């Protein structure tokens, strides 16, 4: 997730950048990196949805050790989150000056790093929060014996770790993970749009000090509803029995947890069927409601769908499916677009969106 986000943020790639994946085996730095399934080449979005180690390694190497290290620490790794609990671990990322080529390559898909589950979930929450990292906390308020609130904790933004555009693109690509073609299809929940990522990591063998070929951790992290996130869930299965893959053992557990939590938290369903657009705040503009069926039909016909009224996250999610680069002006909701709705896309390579903030 974070290597791709860093490369997008640095302008090195787009969701449709094609990465040569070497048919499943690639020698780098004197070692061979493998993919579970051999791929000839993949788009950036497919590197994520198909969990290509080789694709991620090539992207990380294009960033270089110092830049990749700097961007990983920006996401909150290698230092405590400062949650309101004692004894928190900072995790461990070796200094960039100690990274060899193979270290940069493997760090790009999460190997050779030590991060806590809390750090990982908080970093994914930054994607869900439009690029803003929020300090996690456990206790929301403290009450006296009479039930009076004597202290209340408010959500605290630490800072922006990626642009809203990068966060929106990452969300759209993470949604592809939870499709029939992605590795996280077993995390799909009827009526909800889920953005997520599977993980399968080798553990260190304490006897040899090298990565074990028998001991693994399987994981799935995701947030939902993807277009208006309210819940981040991380499931880690230590030394799973049978299948070792996150998509097989952790994704179903994510689904079970989410299906139990959604009704308890009062998070409504129906997001998969409909994108409810906002009223445009521009004087004289008409409110727009774009159904997913209408958008899908426009995409099938290779015509520009109507984006007015959508948030930046929603609009970029649609455009990523078209393979269009996008220039964004302003923040908030789309009030103007070029190409216009219904226009054919033959020969069109880019799109311009103008946004304005929602009126209170």
Give a label for each model feature:
Residues 1-237:
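Beta-lactam-recognizing serine transpeptidase/beta-lactamase-like catalytic domain environment
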Residues 188-191, 235-239, 243-248, 253-360:
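Ligand-recognition elements built from short beta-strands and adjacent flexible loops
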């Amino acid at each position: 997730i974070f290597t791709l986000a860093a490369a997008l943020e640095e302008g090195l790639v787009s969701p449709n950048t094609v990465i040569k994946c070497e048919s499943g085996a690639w020698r780098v730095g004197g070692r061979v990196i493998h993919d579970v399934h051999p791929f000839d080449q993949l788009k950036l979005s497919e590197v994520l949805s198909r969990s290509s180690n080789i694709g991620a390694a090539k992207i990380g190497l294009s960033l270089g050790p110092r830049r990749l290290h700097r961007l990983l620490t920006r996401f909150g790794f290698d230092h405590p989150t400062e949650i309101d609990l004692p004894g928190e671990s900072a995790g461990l990322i070796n200094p960039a000056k100690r990274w060899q080529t193979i270290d940069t390559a493997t760090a790009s898909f999460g190997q050779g790093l030590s991060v806590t589950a809390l750090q990982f979930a908080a970093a994914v929450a930054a994607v869900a929060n439009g690029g803003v990292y929020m300090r996690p906390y456990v206790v929301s308020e403290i009450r006296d014996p009479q039930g009076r609130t004597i202290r209340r904790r408010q959500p605290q933004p630490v800072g922006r770790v990626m642009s809203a555009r990068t966060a929106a693109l990452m969300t759209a690509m993470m949604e592809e993970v939870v499709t029939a073609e992605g590795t996280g299809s077993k995390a799909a929940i009827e009526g909800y749009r889920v953005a997520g990522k599977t993980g399968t990591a080798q553990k260190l063998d304490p006897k040899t000090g090298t990565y074990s070929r028998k001991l693994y951790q399987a994981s799935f992290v995701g947030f939902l509803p993807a277009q208006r996130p309210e819940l981040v869930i991380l499931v880690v299965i230590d030394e799973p029995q049978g299948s070792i893959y996150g998509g097989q053992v952790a994704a179903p557990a994510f689904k079970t947890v989410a299906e139990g939590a959604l009704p308890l938290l009062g998070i409504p369903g129906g997001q998969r069927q409909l994108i409810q657009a906002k009223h445009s705040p521009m004087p004289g503009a008409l409110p727009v409601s774009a159904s997913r069926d209408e958008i899908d039909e426009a995409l099938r016909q290779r015509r520009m769908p109507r984006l007015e009224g959508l948030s930046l996250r929603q609009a970029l999610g649609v455009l990523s499916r078209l393979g269009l680069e996008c220039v964004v002006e302003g923040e908030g909701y789309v009030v103007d677009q070029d190409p216009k709705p219904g226009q054919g896309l033959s020969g069109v390579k880019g799109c311009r969106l103008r946004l304005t903030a929602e009126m209170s």
